[in-house]
Amino acid sequence: MNHKTILVTGASRGIGKAIALTYAKNGWDVVITCLRREEELKKTQREIEALGVSCLAWMGDAGDFESCSRLFDAIRERFGSLDVLVNNAGISYIGLFQDMTPDEWNHILNTNLTSVFNCCRLAVPMMVSHKSGRILNISSVWGVCGASCEVAYSATKGGINAMTRALAKELAPSSIQVNAIACGAIDTEMNQFLDEEERNALLEEIPAGRMGRAEEVGKLAYQLGSEDSYLTGQIIQLDGGWI
């Protein structure tokens, strides 16, 4: 059986892991990446391989182009090509903008936005050559409306949204769809800093009355990446009606 192949960046846990497992459960070979959490990445790899598909786990910096180039060399060698790219790698910075250092700004920009450029730049020629492919960028509602004390994070997600729309237009003639999921409050480790009072206040703002689950992002990501569709260039908000 010729399995299709997906690359998910930032897949050691949370949303990235949920997306990777969803595709694996549907018979896809999976490439997963992480920068620092090697043991968690290996655990995810074992879970994926237990589903009967092949999994390449790669430790490296998606924000570094040369590092990404080595990753894509490994993908070509092992799988031949790539059918779906999910740009999920990301970090947050919470604090006053006036206290942010240039190094902190550059770090979040490289991790959240430059990584998307790097992976898209390397994946697009592969997809164009086959006149087929899907690119899915994991964004945030803060990229739509902005968030106080998360200026840099909001800026990177807004950049991802703009890049999604522009790249979708450029790649549509090659039958490649590019979309983004703008997540609201998803119940992952990234939101574990909230204390009980803050969490309850947040839930009161969400019409659905709860935070989203990583598995729900995985389900939507699978639908967008696995089905033939006229849908491209869209920023799909998955936020329980919050924003």
Question: Can you name each region flagged by the protein language model?
Answer:
Residues 96-97, 104-109, 198, 202:
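Substrate-binding pocket helix/loop in short-chain dehydrogenase/reductase
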Residues 12-13:
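Conserved glycine-rich cofactor-binding loop
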Residues 26-43:
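Conserved glycine-rich Rossmann-like NAD(P)H-binding loop of the short-chain dehydrogenase/reductase
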Residues 125, 169-173:
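Alpha-helical segment proximal to the catalytic Tyr-Lys
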Residues 120, 156, 164:
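Active-site helix of classical SDR
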Residues 140:
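Residue(s) in the substrate-gating loop at a strand-loop-helix junction
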Residues 132, 176, 210-238:
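C-terminal substrate-recognition "lid" of short-chain dehydrogenase/reductases
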